[in-house]
Amino acid sequence: MSEPKQAKRYIVSGSVQGVGFRYFTQNAAERLHLSGYAKNLPDGRVEVYAIGTPEQLAKLRSALERGPWGASVSEVREEQAAIDPNYANGFVITY
């Protein structure tokens, strides 16, 4: 029996815009079979919303903490979120 899905929202701080962070996140999420989105925030942080099993989400968080080459992640804040059916199929970059 598979684990039930849940949703999490991550706010990633540091040097995370202009370094391919959203594309890195999309690639990691797709490899983990997660759905959701990544978007730049006006204050320089990146918001990531993901739906998956606790194990998949933990692996995504590890990837977010590393970031792509050229990024410098100083903090990843995590919070539970409601599952939004609008983002239940596939992982997208939003603007």
Residue spans for each PLM region:
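Intrinsically disordered, low-complexity, mixed-charge
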Residues: 1-95
